[in-house]
Design a protein with these regions (language model features):
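Extracellular/periplasmic envelope-modification machinery, especially enzymes
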Residues: 1-168
Length: 168
């Protein structure tokens, strides 16, 4: 199914050389009822979940972008992902305003890294860009996003990756 035809407004939000960062997949033609949102972790969830014919999955994600409203997640020296939060905001708005979406699956590969000030990833609260407390930003963004989705009657599933096992 052609996800990009359904969401032409997603075009141009990633830099041209990195358009593969705009993850947009629809399981089959028709209205979706499950939305996967977050970053590339969804690319590993989508194939397995697509085996369930009872649902129609829609994946709207962006590279390295946490599944929260008005939050930019980038690597510290990264300039090409500056606008990816717009893709996430669009996906969340679609879920909230689309009555057919019943379940929202939120995932983020590096979620624990966002509260670690030593990590290469950083998180910016776009409503309050002067904020520097990563843990507070994470908690507020998570709470704000969940509040919006739950008020809209969505069931929310949050998926975390398996932890790294630190051995050779």
């Amino acid at each position: 199914a052609d996800c990009r035809a359904m969401f032409p407004e997603r075009e141009g939000k990633t830099v041209k050389e990195r358009d593969e960062d705009n993850f947009c997949y629809l399981q089959k033609p028709g209205s979706p009822d499950v939305l996967l949102i977050g970053d590339s972790l969804n690319l590993s969830l989508f194939p397995g979940l697509s085996h369930y014919d009872d649902y129609n999955l829609l994946l709207l994600s962006a590279s390295a972008q946490a599944p929260f409203f008005d939050v930019r997640t980038t690597e510290r020296n990264d300039s090409y992902r500056e606008r990816y939060f717009e893709l996430t905001n669009q996906a969340l708005e679609f879920a909230i305003h689309n009555a057919k979406i019943k379940v929202v699956v939120m995932s983020f590969l590096n979620g624990v890294a966002l509260t670690n000030s030593e990590h290469a990833l950083k998180m910016t609260d776009l409503r309050h860009p002067e904020r520097k407390d990563a843990r507070g930003i994470f908690i507020d963004a998570f709470r704000n996003t969940l509040d919006h989705l739950i008020r809209a009657g969505k069931s929310v599933v949050f998926v975390l990756p398996n932890p790294d096992i630190p051995y050779d």
